[in-house]
UniProtKB/Swiss-Prot annotation:
UniProt key word Isomerase: no
Pfam families given in the database record: Kinase-PPPase
Record lineage: Bacteria, Bacillati, Bacillota, Bacilli, Bacillales
Annotated protein name in UniProt: Putative pyruvate, phosphate dikinase regulatory protein
Main function: Bifunctional serine/threonine kinase and phosphorylase involved in the regulation of the pyruvate, phosphate dikinase (PPDK) by catalyzing its phosphorylation/dephosphorylation.
Broadest EC class assigned to this enzyme: transferase
Annotated keywords: Kinase, Nucleotide-binding, Serine/threonine-protein kinase, Transferase
Residues binding ADP: 149-156
Similarity comment: family membership: Belongs to the pyruvate, phosphate/water dikinase regulatory protein family. PDRP subfamily.
Organism listed in the record: Geobacillus kaustophilus (strain HTA426)
Source organism, top-level taxon: Bacteria
Length: 266
């Protein structure tokens, strides 16, 4: 059976559109409908990519894009590709504007003004998810904080913890075989933090990780020579960037976060 899929596209967090889509999808208990959110869309290239995915997966696109140019582009692109695209917010904005003789601001994310603190936290959490593990280097220059380190140095849990403090965090893994994204070298040193760890501690953590996955704990991932190679490369990268380095060997995530936040306040 083909999957039933709806892409939820938004120039903000996408919570509004997702709630509407899930409310509609809840009427079809016998045939579950999967919802995939695509938040913080800022360019037409991303819209075109979503349309291509929707066409390939025979999916529907539901969207909240407040900028008319972006709405019109998505609707035109979807029509050209034979994809169903449903505008959740646009028609209502236009009706309100016409009936009440008001001019819309056409600015994404205005609903967050209703509860700025709460929504800042949600936005930061979503940011941390979107820009986790170096998956999109565009987030590096948009972040309040950038974390770098080799695998298993708590980059992801630390990013999430800081996100709950309403800080937008991107994290980037440092791997000898992969050139760091050029954006890393354009970040101000005051917002980039390298997470350092002792070889012995990292070896122990990685072996436990492999065991938990049911894998051989003697794999190259948990080899001491490999670990030393990764840490040496990490040292080269942080030296080139000139960022602060925090030793996380025996630190809890909360302790590391506290150090980072104190440094940010300087």
């Amino acid at each position: 059976m083909n999957q039933r899929l709806v892409y939820v596209v938004s120039d903000s967090g996408g919570e509004t559109a997702e709630l509407v889509v899930k409310a509609a999808a809840s009427q079809f208990h016998a045939s579950p409908i999967q919802v995939k959110r695509v938040p913080y869309v800022e360019d037409k290239t991303t819209l075109a990519e979503v349309v291509a995915l929707a066409k390939m997966n025979r999916a529907i696109i539901a969207f909240t894009l407040v900028v008319p140019e972006m709405r019109e582009f998505l609707l035109a692109e979807a029509a050209r590709e034979g994809v169903v695209a449903y505008d959740i917010i646009g028609p209502l904005i236009e009706k309100m504007s016409h009936l009440f003789q008001l001019t819309p601001r056409y600015e994404p994310g205005q609903v967050r003004v209703l509860d700025e603190d709460y929504f800042k936290k949600i936005e930061a959490i979503e940011f941390a998810v979107k820009y986790d593990d170096g998956r999109d280097p565009r987030g590096i220059l948009r972040a309040d904080i950038v974390l770098i380190g080799v695998s298993r140095t708590s980059k992801t849990p630390l990013s999430q913890y800081l996100a709950h403090k309403r800080l937008k965090v991107a994290n980037v893994p440092i791997v000898p075989e992969v050139e760091p994204p050029e954006q890393l070298f354009r970040v101000g040193p005051g917002k980039c933090f390298g997470l350092k760890i002792s070889p012995d501690k990292l070896l122990s953590i990685r072996r436990e990780r492999l065991k938990s996955l049911g894998l051989n704990d003697q794999a190259i991932y948990a080899n001491m020579d490999r670990i030393k190679e990764e840490l040496a490369y990490f040292d080269e990268v942080v030296k080139k960037i000139g960022c602060d380095v925090i030793d996380v060997t025996n630190k809890a995530v909360e302790e590391t976060a506290s150090i980072i936040m104190k440094k940010l306040k300087r």
